């Protein structure tokens, strides 16, 4: 306010004493509108979710908007606007034979300025990736996890490929959230690579003003880099966001880079641990000083760190272990050069599995672990930390119709009973389990 020239004699533009007072102002701004929530209170929302609209005097929200048949027009009647069919702005052709669509992730919101600061919300989808039909991948000799270049008439980005039968042939999908804060790199000309919207068209609907982000013509090609980096580290809660920001500032020094948070599995309301995952690649190893900076930010520069280095071959490995009374856990690691051990070492770290028997074998890590590692389980319900395996196991004891089995499942595990965003996936798993029975 001082920067805007406000004097002490003028009223404050931010007269808020609590988060509730901010919310109360927002609530009042909805009065009389189709999203009227003036019947809600902050205390009610603290206890449980509420459905809008819920105007003042209502005891519960409406199940359907405009259910009484009155619409926000001058005469209260709905208006239908005839809109002629318009083809997509950009058609596929030989140079760009695939249709790129973008959209939301279940647990993230738009630019992730808020959700992107919570490691637990990366539990459902852990890192940026391009989703492709398995047959389209096979035709291009692309395997899951391979880095690919996605090109459109406007630019190009790099990302790992991920097989998905939910994506149709000739189509690819990338979540709209993966901007340059999480997915970046450096082009051959030295320019910083942007996120997914580097690829999309600038065309928008003349009526609704919605951008045409659901269809862009692209080409996808496997990209083979000679050098790779993979690093994960648990970090102190009071510094993890600051260290992630510092790592993000280094992303443009690599030809490909992604940087995201992760967290320990916890139930909503509990405080878990948080960490950062950095992945990078290039045709040549980067400067040693850059890798030293990454080591420092991931707290891999202390005396308690096991190290191996072969600068001539571009190989570096660093491992930080934590001793507990009855076991040892992997707290951080960095693989530079040969990163084939990423998957099982990541599981070892994220799941806090005992690591005391691995010792220095972690520095000679290859594609196969020297000792068995329990596979990581996929999180379905982020709010209540319910895994796919827990759902499958519980469903074996459920009986009745799909709705009855769903109710039994929720009575036991409570999955899908908080925010509800995972409910479609849970219902799908109930149907699939019933079909397989």
Language-model region placement:
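Long, contiguous, secondary-structure-rich segments that constitute the structural scaffold
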Residues: 1-37, 41-42, 115-131, 135-302
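Long, low-complexity segments enriched in small/aliphatic residues
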Residues: 6-115
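Cys/His-clustered metal-coordination modules, chiefly Zn-binding fingers
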Residues: 396, 412, 431
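Short, glycine-/Ser/Thr-/acidic-enriched flexible segments
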Residues: 76-78, 85-87, 103-107, 135-137, ...
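Immediate flanking context of iron-sulfur cluster ligation sites
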Residues: 368-378, 400-417
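Local cysteine-cluster metal-coordination motifs and their immediate loop/turn environment
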Residues: 378-390, 411-428
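Cysteine/selenocysteine-centered motifs that mediate thiol-based redox chemistry or coordinate metal-sulfur cofactors
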Residues: 190-216, 356-389
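C-terminal catalytic lobe of FAD-dependent flavoproteins
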Residues: 260-362
């Amino acid at each position: 306010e001082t920067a805007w020239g406000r004097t002490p004699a003028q009223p404050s533009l931010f007269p808020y004493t609590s988060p509730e007072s901010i919310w109360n102002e927002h609530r009042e701004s909805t009065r009389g509108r189709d999203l009227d929530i003036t019947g809600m209170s902050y205390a009610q929302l603290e206890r449980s979710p509420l459905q809008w609209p819920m105007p003042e005097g209502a005891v519960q929200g409406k199940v359907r908007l405009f259910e009484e048949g009155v619409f926000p027009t001058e005469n209260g009647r709905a208006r239908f606007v005839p809109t002629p069919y318009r083809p997509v702005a950009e058609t596929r052709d030989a140079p760009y034979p695939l249709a790129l669509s973008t959209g939301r992730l279940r647990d993230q919101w738009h630019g992730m300025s808020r959700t992107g600061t919570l490691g637990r919300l990366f539990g459902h989808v852990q890192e940026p990736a391009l989703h492709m039909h398995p047959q389209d991948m096979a035709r291009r000799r692309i395997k899951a996890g391979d880095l690919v270049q996605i090109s459109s008439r406007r630019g190009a980005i790099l990302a790992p490929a991920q097989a998905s039968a939910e994506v149709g042939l000739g189509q690819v999908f990338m979540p709209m959230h993966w901007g340059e804060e999480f997915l970046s790199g450096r082009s051959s000309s030295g320019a910083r690579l942007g996120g997914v919207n580097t690829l999309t068209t600038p065309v928008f609907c003349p009526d609704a003003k919605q951008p045409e982000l659901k269809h862009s013509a692209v080409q996808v090609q496997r990209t083979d880099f000679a050098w790779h980096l993979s690093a994960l580290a648990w970090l102190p809660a009071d510094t993890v966001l600051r260290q992630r920001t510092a790592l993000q500032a280094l992303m443009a020094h690599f030809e490909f880079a992604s940087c995201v948070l992760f967290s320990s599995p916890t139930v909503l309301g509990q405080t878990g641990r948080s960490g950062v995952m950095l992945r990078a690649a290039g045709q040549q190893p980067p400067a040693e000083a850059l890798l030293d900076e990454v080591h420092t930010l991931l707290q891999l520069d202390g005396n308690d760190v096991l190290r191996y280095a072969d600068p001539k071959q571009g190989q570096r490995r660093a491992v930080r272990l934590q001793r507990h009374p009855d076991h040892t856990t992997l707290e951080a690691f960095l693989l530079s050069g040969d990163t084939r051990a990423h998957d099982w070492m990541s599981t070892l770290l994220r799941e806090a599995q005992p690591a005391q028997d691995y010792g220095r074998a972690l520095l000679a890590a290859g594609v196969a672990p020297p000792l068995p590692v329990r596979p990581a389980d996929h999180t379905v319900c982020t709010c209540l930390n319910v895994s796919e395996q827990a759902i499958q196991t519980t469903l074996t004891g459920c009986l009745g119709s799909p709705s009855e089995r769903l109710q039994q499942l929720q009575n036991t595990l409570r999955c899908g009973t908080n925010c509800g965003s995972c409910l479609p996936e849970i219902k799908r798993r109930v149907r699939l389990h019933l079909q397989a029975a």
